[in-house]
Swiss-Prot record:
Lineage per the UniProt record: Eukaryota, Metazoa, Chordata, Craniata, Vertebrata
SUPFAM superfamilies in the record: Actin-like ATPase domain
Region (Disordered): 1-23
Chain's role: Testis-specic protein that plays an important role in fusion of proacrosomal vesicles and perinuclear theca formation.
Main location: cytoplasm
UniProt similarity note: Belongs to the actin family.
GO biological process assignments: acrosome assembly; fertilization; single fertilization
Name of the gene: ACTL9
Record's subcellular location: Cytoplasmic vesicle, Secretory vesicle, Acrosome; Cytoplasm, Cytoskeleton, Perinuclear theca
Record InterPro entries: Actin (IPR004000), ATPase_NBD (IPR043129)
Pfam families linked: Actin
Species this chain originates from: Bos taurus
SMART domains in the record: ACTIN
Protein's name in the database: Actin-like protein 9
């Protein structure tokens, strides 16, 4: 049972719809996607009936065809709405904008359909999916199987809803729902590992063994990229730089380009302020001088602020706690496959600091291998691309006729 599943009322097992098993260990070892330049990915002609992989996160939604090395399109997970009165009738209609097009229009009401990795507004989520599938990929969804990623801690009803949307709204011929952490493991060509994922809305550590999550050892921290951006914006305001809502992209740009993780926070903090200062030129021509803010921002991932009633721990301690909760016979294998994933793990210095602190928290004899792929912000999507393109996976799709016979509960039989 995975960490997402609660105790749903499931229909009795049906012998005619067995849950296929995959021997992925040997398959994934041989399955590597071509490492082509990103510009080439979008230039491919889309297959007429190829599977489409959809990974919707708090910050961005990634979409592309199975078998490709990277998602073809990445769009901000934002929908902007404004009433518009048509010329032919008096009834106002709602005009919508997706992604950056919405963020750049201050007159719009913005909706973020995903909070802390979980879809909370299905209408807005469907608008984004339709836009990316029909407008960006230019495909007819009735011709393409759809693979959706599903985050840890999502309610089981969300998986049922994904099945309904895929078949009822998008008219897909087949679909599948896959665990995000399991897909991240597949992206590394493995079936077991400790996934350390810090993205835009949430951070979690999930042990995965032989393609299955270990829910009892999963850790969660409700602090990630969006919180770092807000913290940096607060420090920029304190330095005298006026910021509006439309400047959040500027703050994000500063965070990604200039912020770094200090090897030793106390030593870095003790450096003279002048040694740390950098003068940055912003896209609009303004300049801002920053110093210790550049490493104080991502430090939150290692020393999160206390919350009333809670004492959250940093990401390395979360990983150590996950390892301590798994069976001793699994610990060595997982410790040698610690997989950094998510865009907030891309800071310069993150991997080295994480490994140093994790080793400090483990017994001296522990052997730890931390892997950090350059494309780890796409790990979930890449894992989905690999899985959906495997020949042995094709019997695992939830088919339309199975949905029509069994309803959305079919997801518990055929999907992880």
């Amino acid at each position: 049972m995975d960490p997402n599943q609660g105790n749903p009322l499931e229909p009795q097992d049906s012998p005619e719809i067995p849950k296929p098993s995959l021997n992925l260990s040997s398959i994934l070892a041989k399955s590597t996607l071509p490492q082509e330049p990103p510009s080439m990915v979008g230039d491919r002609l889309p297959p007429k009936t190829g599977a489409v992989v959809i990974d919707m996160g708090t910050g961005t939604c990634k979409v592309g065809f199975a078998g490709q090395a990277r998602p073809t399109y990445t769009v901000a997970t934002i929908v902007g709405c404004q009433p518009q009165k048509p010329a032919t009738s008096g009834q106002p209609v709602m005009e919508t904008f997706i992604g950056e097009a919405a963020r750049k229009r201050p007159e719009l009401t913005l909706v973020q359909p995903v909070h802390s990795g979980i879809v909370v507004d299905w209408d807005a989520a469907e608008l984004i999916w339709r836009h990316m599938l029909e407008h960006d990929l230019r495909v007819a969804t009735r011709d393409h199987p759809l693979l959706f990623s599903d985050p840890p801690f999502s309610p089981s009803t969300n998986r049922e809803k994904l099945v309904e949307v895929a078949f009822e709204s998008l008219s897909s011929p087949a679909m599948y729902v896959a665990s995000q952490s399991v897909l991240s493991v597949y992206a590394h060509g493995r079936v077991s590992g400790l996934v350390v994922d810090t993205g835009h809305g949430v951070t979690y550590t999930v042990p995965v063994f032989q393609g299955y999550n270990l829910p009892h050892a999963t850790q969660r921290l409700d602090l990630a990229g969006t919180h770092l951006t807000a913290f940096l914006a607060e420090m920029l305001l304190g330095s005298g730089l006026p910021l509006g809502q439309q400047d959040l992209d500027t703050v994000e740009n500063i965070k990604h380009r200039y912020c770094y993780v200090a090897p030793d926070f106390l030593k870095e903090q003790a450096r003279p302020e002048l040694e740390c200062r950098q003068t940055l030129k912003l896209p609009d021509g303004r300049t801002v001088t920053l110093g210790k803010e550049l490493f104080q921002c991502p430090e939150l991932l290692f020393s999160p602020p206390e919350i009333p009633g809670l004492s959250p721990v940093g990401v390395p301690t979360m990983a150590q706690q996950s390892l301590s909760k798994v069976a001793a016979e699994l610990r060595t294998d997982l410790a040698q496959n610690v997989l950094l994933c998510g865009g907030s793990s891309l800071f310069t210095g993150f991997q080295a600091r994480f490994q140093t602190e994790l080793l400090r928290n483990l017994p001296p004899e522990a052997h730890v291998v931390v892997m950090a792929q350059p494309t780890r912000n796409f790990s979930v999507w890449i894992g989905g691309s690999i899985l959906a393109s495997l020949r042995t996976f094709q019997s695992c799709w939830v088919l339309r006729e199975q949905y029509e016979e069994q309803g959305p509960y079919i997801v518990y039989r055929k999907c992880y």
